[in-house]
């Protein structure tokens, strides 16, 4: 059966057909992380896309001099890791588990393949990126 039930509750996948959810459910890999464990390191090459299925993570930017800025706290149903997969540049921030966390991971190859084959998913990714850009603009103008 895979992870289709969990995927139905993820806004990114809400508009997908049941057959698309089944396919995604078969290729997503569950990954568990303990509190404090780093999932993505800023500056690393992008190898995956993650959907948060349980727990909580924080997205952190290194400001240098042993300082950091928390950019976001993500909860189940949200996703991360897409930016570096799309633009091919290194990761722009680190992602760390706040508490015991499970993510469903999609490899770079599968992520790109899904975007090419699913206009609905592509549009939802673009919408999510636009929302994040709008939030960043609002934060910077405060």
Language-model features, listed with the residues they occupy:
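Cytosolic regulatory regions built on CNB/CRP/Popeye-like sensor folds
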Residues: 1-142
